[in-house]
Design a protein with these regions (language model features):
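Short, well-ordered loop/turn elements at secondary-structure boundaries
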Residues: 55-56, 76-77, 156
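N-terminal flexible segment immediately upstream of the FAD-binding catalytic core
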Residues: 1-51, 68-98, 127, 150
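Glycine-rich beta-strand-to-loop/alpha-helix junction loops that act as flexible
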Residues: 63-67
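FAD-binding subdomain of flavoenzyme oxidoreductases
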Residues: 89-93, 98-192
Length: 192
């Protein structure tokens, strides 16, 4: 896993499409830089980075496509930014059951193109499809142009895998509807 500690290299990790930050003086920008940026290349490295942040009392700021418009990637306290862009691609595509598993760092357009090449679609076309990652689409509980036909992102999901604050991996199982308690994935869907 690579780590970024140089001040100038860390600046890109606090800029998204939020217009206010573009007017900030340099001193304010520098005051909001993360302590460190982790660039993992596997889920196990994401777990290591999250555990490091947990052990060192650092807030975690995930960095995907930087497509946000409200400055959500700007740290407000000592933080570790985790750049998810190298955790990308399709894990599995089950054409018989119309089920695809993709990593959080895969861009929405890449996922859609992958499916289109095989005669399928997600039917999910948010305005940010070219800028947002799968993880970002889930974290913002994304909706899109064809949501009235295909549903929102949460309607398309059958499961998710999440790294918890202590570095452990949580995987929900796809089970029939249950009345035995809350639907745990909803703790993460729309969590931005």
């Amino acid at each position: 896993m690579n780590f970024i500690q140089e001040k100038d290299a860390k600046k890109k990790y606090i800029f998204d499409w939020w217009p206010a930050i573009k007017k900030w003086p340099e001193a304010k920008v520098e005051a909001h830089l993360p302590e460190i940026v982790a660039v993992p290349e596997s889920v196990s490295e994401v777990q290591e980075a999250v555990k490091y942040a947990y052990d060192n009392n650092l807030a975690i700021v995930p960095f995907g496509g930087a497509s946000g418009v409200l400055g959500g990637i700007v740290p407000e306290k000592p933080s570790l930014t985790i750049d998810m862009q190298k955790i990308t691609g399709v894990v599995e595509f089950d054409q018989d059951n119309h089920f695809i598993t993709a990593y959080a760092g895969m861009f929405g357009r890449e996922l859609e193109d992958y499916l289109n090449e095989r005669g399928y679609t997600t039917g999910h076309y948010p305005q940010s499809i070219d800028l947002a990652t799968v993880g970002g689409l889930v974290a913002t509980k994304s909706a899109g142009t064809f949501s009235s036909k295909y549903g929102n992102i949460e309607d398309m999901m059958q499961g998710l895998e999440v790294v918890l604050p202590n570095g452990e991996l949580f995987t929900n199982r796809n089970v029939p509807r249950s009345a035995t308690g809350p639907y745990i994935p909803n703790l993460f869907i729309g969590s931005e």
